[in-house]
């Protein structure tokens, strides 16, 4: 495993561990998801450069577009829950009561 692959894998795993262990606030969960998506984007962009093919060059842009949609949806949910519940703590959110 090259140092570049190790750094991107460790960045993804750190984001995943942050998502698993620090799930107290919705904002911290969204930041961990964004870190995971950023590491995937950089790894996919380097993978497309490595193969030097035009077919692989659209995949990072597609991932970036989905990441932007995910971020906007997450922020909209964060604003909606902060307005209705008064906090962004994930323990206070119950799908049966919403």
UniProtKB/Swiss-Prot annotation:
Membrane topology, as annotated: Multi-pass membrane protein
InterPro entries per the UniProt record, alphabetical: NADH_UbQ_OxRdtase_chain4L/K (IPR001133), NUOK/Mnh_C1-like (IPR039428)
MF-aspect GO terms: NADH dehydrogenase (ubiquinone) activity
EC number: 7.1.1.2
Short name of any one Pfam family annotated for the protein: Oxidored_q2
Gene Ontology CC, one term: mitochondrial membrane
Primary subcellular site in the record, as a coarse category: mitochondrion
Residues annotated as transmembrane: 1-21, 29-49, 59-79
Record carries keyword Kinase: no
Subcellular location, record wording: Mitochondrion membrane
GO BP terms, alphabetized: ATP synthesis coupled electron transport
Record key words, sorted: Electron transport, Membrane, Mitochondrion, NAD, Respiratory chain, Translocase, Transmembrane, Transmembrane helix, Transport, Ubiquinone
Reaction catalysis annotation: a ubiquinone + NADH + 5 H(+)(in) = a ubiquinol + NAD(+) + 4 H(+)(out)
Keyword Zinc applies: no
Family: Belongs to the complex I subunit 4L family.
Job of this protein: Core subunit of the mitochondrial membrane respiratory chain NADH dehydrogenase (Complex I) which catalyzes electron transfer from NADH through the respiratory chain, using ubiquinone as an electron acceptor. Part of the enzyme membrane arm which is embedded in the lipid bilayer and involved in proton translocation.
Protein name (record): NADH-ubiquinone oxidoreductase chain 4L
């Amino acid at each position: 495993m090259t140092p570049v692959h190790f750094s991107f894998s460790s960045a993804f795993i750190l984001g995943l561990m942050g998502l698993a262990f620090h799930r107290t606030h919705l904002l911290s969960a969204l930041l961990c998801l964004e870190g995971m998506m950023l590491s995937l984007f950089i790894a996919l962009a380097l993978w497309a450069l490595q193969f030097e093919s035009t077919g692989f060059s659209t995949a990072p842009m597609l991932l970036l577009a989905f990441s932007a949609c995910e971020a906007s949806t997450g922020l909209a949910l964060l604003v909606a829950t902060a307005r209705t519940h008064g906090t962004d703590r994930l323990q206070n959110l119950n799908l049966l009561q919403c």
